[in-house]
Amino acid sequence: MQLTLNLSGSAGMQLLLLVSSLLLWENVSSKPTAMVPTEDLYTRLAELLHNTFILAADVYREFDLDFFDKTWITDRTLPLCHTASIHTPENREEVHETKTEDLLKAMINVSISWKEPLKHLVSALTALPGASESMGKKAADIKGRNLVILEGLQTIYNRSQANIEENENFDYPAWSGLEELQSPNEDTHLFAVYNLCRCIKRDIHKIDSYIKVLRCRVVFQNEC
């Protein structure tokens, strides 16, 4: 998978360094020793996801503080996140009962499903009057990190499959919120931005929780 990152300045450099470091998890030469052990991938992903959740929570919190207004949420029902159709365990017991491969596949589906909406969230926050520069930069950081997270999850998943099909398809839902996000109606636009901030925070937290369980299961044989 080729990553394309369109960032500039210090934030862009930090992200490029992050990607350069984390992409070492896959073989960079023909030598088997160049492949980072799966156990290390889990550790790196766990740290990356934890930090990404902090960023997502910051973006949500800042948007909520600066833009939340009863005028654009009154008489509106919070919609389901576009990833709601992806079957994921809902509690700790279900997580522990789910096979490693199935949990990884669900996490990959969630990550893939955010590639497109994150692009538009970055654009929306960057262009939003009154939004801080840091909020847009954090959203761009989340967007780049999601690509790295996806790369890592796919690497681990591929290694876990003895007879994996080439170019295996993943069943992820399409995002259909662009019209609302680009609406000329300010209330509709802000409500759409709010829901993206809310849902990315929710989904990153979910994947973060799952990777911790899998790391405990795979690396420490559930002794943690």
UniProtKB/Swiss-Prot annotation:
Protein localization: Secreted
Family (UniProt): Belongs to the somatotropin/prolactin family.
Record protein name field: Prolactin-3D1
Cross-referenced InterPro entries: 4_helix_cytokine-like_core, Somatotropin/Prolactin, Somatotropin_CS
Keyword Repeat: no
Cystines in this chain: 81-199, 216-224
Pfam families: Hormone_1 (PF00103)
Organism (species): Mus musculus
Principal place of residence: secreted
One Gene Ontology CC term in the entry: extracellular space
Gene name of this polypeptide: Prl3d1
GO molecular function: hormone activity
Keyword set, alphabetical order: Disulfide bond, Glycoprotein, Hormone, Secreted, Signal
Residues bearing glycans: 109, 158
Signal peptide: 1-29
